[in-house]
Regions:
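Canonical Radical SAM [4Fe-4S] cluster-binding loop centered on the CxxxCxxC motif
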Residues: 3-35
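Short acidic donor-binding/metal-coordinating loop in glycosyltransferase active sites
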Residues: 9, 56-57
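A broad structural signal for short, well-ordered beta-strand segments within beta-sheet-rich domains
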Residues: 1-2, 167
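Radical SAM/AdoMet-radical enzyme domain recognition
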Residues: 31-55, 61-190
Length: 191
């Protein structure tokens, strides 16, 4: 049976990232209701799934995200959340802990100027604050970076920043020619 999965719980997103492979903007008209999503959680538990990452879009734009995490936890599935970090404050962090989330991953795609250009002005500062808030709640935080020509030279500086913030988990993915990235093909590194 499957061990791990990624579930895009919404295509709704407050950002319009230049490299988003899913071209997220608003919610799809046929997104799952809370009741449907909770049934999916139960089905995943019956399948024996061990861990899942909730992503999107931006998972925290769903009002019921904590109910989904809670149901996954009830089904003995380790739940992680991948976020752009914009909405993470004390309340969100506490809800994540209370619902049983094990980790919150945040996308960081460069130093402040680069990251804000790619994602949204002010988002870098919110991520730095979110990392402090999550640590204050005892929540493990990971960083995910999409690597492309606009940020590859910044990786050593990003590493320094993450060490300063106490981040121990840094994941990379190569920017792929899909979604919004199709408008920025010159960013894709050569093999």
């Amino acid at each position: 049976s499957p061990i791990a999965a990624v579930w895009e719980i919404t295509m709704n997103c407050n950002m319009r990232c230049k490299h988003c492979g899913s071209s997220c903007s608003g919610p799809l008209p046929d997104e799952l209701t809370t009741e449907e999503a909770l049934r999916v959680c139960d089905s995943l538990g019956k399948l024996g799934l061990q861990r899942i990452t909730l992503s999107g879009g931006e998972p925290f734009t769903r009002d019921d995200w904590h109910l989904i995490v809670g149901r996954l936890t009830k089904n003995k599935i380790i739940a992680n959340i991948l976020s752009n970090g914009w909405f993470i404050d004390e309340e969100i962090a506490k809800k994540a802990v209370d619902a049983g989330a094990v980790n919150v991953g945040i996308s960081l795609d460069g130093v402040e100027e680069t990251h804000d250009y790619i994602r949204k002005k002010g988002s870098y500062a919110r991520i730095m604050k979110a990392l402090d808030v999550l640590r204050g709640q005892g929540m493990s935080a990971a960083i995910a970076t999409s690597i492309h020509k606009r940020n590859i030279e910044e990786l050593p500086r990003i590493k320094e920043i993450l060490i300063e913030k106490g981040v121990q988990d840094w994941q990379f993915q190569a920017a792929m020619p899909m979604g919004n990235m199709l408008d920025h093909m010159d960013w894709i590194p050569e093999p």
